Amino acid sequence: MKADELRKLDNEQLRAKLKDCYEELFNLRFQQVMGKLTATGRPRMVRRDIARIKTILRERELGIES
């Protein structure tokens, strides 16, 4: 997701999205180990989404608006 889309969500929605991303990353890693992962770039995209969400949550915690 784009950062602009994520900034429109409230904190609870962001935390739910973060949980979903972690679950997806877990499943992707499992598929990779089993040799069934076809979208090899997807884990990287999910990790970046996690970083975006964590950054937005931290900015809000510190009172930084972008």
Curated annotation (Swiss-Prot):
GO terms for biological process: translation. CDD domains: Ribosomal_L29_HIP. GO terms for cellular component: cytosolic large ribosomal subunit. InterPro entries: Ribosomal_protein_uL29, Ribosomal_uL29, Ribosomal_uL29_sf. Signal peptide: none annotated. The keyword Repressor does not apply. Coiled coil: none annotated. The keyword Ribonucleoprotein applies. One of its GO terms (molecular function) is structural constituent of ribosome. Keywords: Ribonucleoprotein, Ribosomal protein. PANTHER family: 60S RIBOSOMAL PROTEIN L35/50S RIBOSOMAL PROTEIN L29, LARGE RIBOSOMAL SUBUNIT PROTEIN UL29C. Belongs to the universal ribosomal protein uL29 family. This is Large ribosomal subunit protein uL29. It comes from Roseiflexus castenholzii (strain DSM 13941 / HLO8).
